[in-house]
């Protein structure tokens, strides 16, 4: 049976989060009433001339630098000609042969693997978004409505080389790409709102061959899981066709998420079908090196760099670092808390387990979380300084969630400071030994886990306030002096 290799390239459209559109002053706010954010330029009215949004250009350059691209000092815009109801001008302003960025790539790690992988980028180019068709929900009313609010919203299209060989690679590539775009704050990457969209180009070829097979482009992929599922389905379909000796045309398909299959939409157009030519209404762009370097100076620390620093400088486990750097806001929150606590590992544990536990449960962002990083840092500092136990800290955390008080105030008001009085702890330890003879006997016979029952008794009597280290040491000393169980 013939074996085949999968070839995957991805085209990602990311809306740039500018206040206004790429060639006009209309707003770009999502969710506004239909056709309320339009003007003569994005409506394609005669005589309306486009003017490039400088902020969009800067964000495109920022993305190129983040992905290690070469920034073109000479670039221009072209008209991509086609007819569709959501494209009022009859053409889209895009970039053809002189994109703003070339080369570069995306580094990512597949879950469970140690080594990272790298996918090259072909280019990043700027273009305007099209409008949106809204189809009637009533099958008896075959009408479609055009909303041009989105028309003219600035986009960058990030085109990869066909370097991916599995749907897993595509999935983790997209996650890494999204993380970088959000880190540098050029796009909110909200797939539900359409600000991040992906098309997958998929083909197969016999293993060992260096020739590409017939390519299928898959659209309508509204989540990374959909990308993965669509690729898996398409590879299976193309493999079955090849094994049966059948051929097919290069084509565009849609992903049907209900039927979980790809459906042919049209045979694929070639670039000459769009009759690209330079847009005569827009001058060419000649960038100065100083402009590019000015943008570079604003680039924040990227996810991989931050993750490596957390591991190498702060001594965090790789998993912790990956969780904390998945989003820039989470990493910022952790570092702000660490400035107060001074203990990286304890702060990491609290942020990734307790804080993100609440964030995920309530389906909110870290920015919407009610407890500031400074207050969490204060709580962790009390633990690190030995002033409260982990059990007491959980109680304080619950109080932090419903009040504006800081951890130290809560601990003082509720008298939760750890008890370090040797005589008082010794009294409770002696009581624990006397009242837990069965656990003592098990411990003396070699069952170390029995010690937990005795410690639990001490913590219960002290209402969780006894110093755990002192309790453990005192118990070990006292139990060690008892004769072994016969």
Curated annotation (Swiss-Prot):
GO terms for biological process: glutaminyl-tRNAGln biosynthesis via transamidation; translation. It catalyses: L-glutamyl-tRNA(Gln) + L-glutamine + ATP + H2O = L-glutaminyl-tRNA(Gln) + L-glutamate + ADP + phosphate + H(+); L-aspartyl-tRNA(Asn) + L-glutamine + ATP + H2O = L-asparaginyl-tRNA(Asn) + L-glutamate + ADP + phosphate + 2 H(+). It holds the Pfam family GatB_N. It is an enzyme of class 6 (ligase). One of its GO terms (molecular function) is ATP binding. Transmembrane segments: none annotated. Keywords: ATP-binding, Ligase, Nucleotide-binding, Protein biosynthesis. It comes from the Bacteria. SMART domains: GatB_Yqey. PROSITE patterns: GATB (PS01234). Its EC number is 6.3.5.-. Gene3D superfamilies: 1.10.10.410, GatB domain, N-terminal subdomain. Allows the formation of correctly charged Asn-tRNA(Asn) or Gln-tRNA(Gln) through the transamidation of misacylated Asp-tRNA(Asn) or Glu-tRNA(Gln) in organisms which lack either or both of asparaginyl-tRNA or glutaminyl-tRNA synthetases. The reaction takes place in the presence of glutamine and ATP through an activated phospho-Asp-tRNA(Asn) or phospho-Glu-tRNA(Gln). Heterotrimer of A, B and C subunits. Belongs to the GatB/GatE family. GatB subfamily. This is Aspartyl/glutamyl-tRNA(Asn/Gln) amidotransferase subunit B.
